[in-house]
C-alpha cells in the first residue's frame, strides 16, 4: 500500500499537511483547514510547538526532541515529522537498509514521495541547534516570553542532532470522527490496527 501524501497549498502549510498525512495513515481524514487552525498558523508559517498542540488536540500523544541519526534509525516508531532544511516539515515513514546503505523514505508536502540516501538526508535534517525539548516550552509556568524561551531551548551548536516530532495515536484519536469520513469504514479499522502491526505479524507467523 502506498504511503499517503497531501500537497501543501502554499509554503506555510507544510506543518499542517505533514500532520494530515500521518492522520490519514492512521485512518483519519482531517481537513487541511482544520489543522491550519489548530496549528495556529500565521504569516510566518507554523512552529513544531504548534504542530504538537494540533496533534494532541486530535488525539495524538507527542514528543518533540533533538535526536541523533542512530536514534531516529533504531529507536523511533515511524512515521514521524521532522524539521527539514531549517524551514520546512516533512514525514519520515520508512528507513531501509540495502546493499550496505541506508535509505530514508519521506512524504514531503512540497514534492511528494521521495527516497533519500543517508548522506543527502542527513545534510538536510541535521541542524545547528542542540538541547531541543518541546516540554520545556509547554511547561512554561513562569510566563517567560516565548521568543526568549525558544532562544534558550535552541541554544548551542551541534551538527549531530536533528529535530523530530514523534506521534502516537491514543483512543481519543479513534473516538473522534474525522472530516467527511465513515467512522467504521475499512480505513478506520486499518488505521486503528497500524500501531500494533508488529504484534499482528508475529501472531500470523
Question: Where are the predicted features?
Answer:
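Membrane-integrated ABC transporters
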Residues: 1-9, 16-205
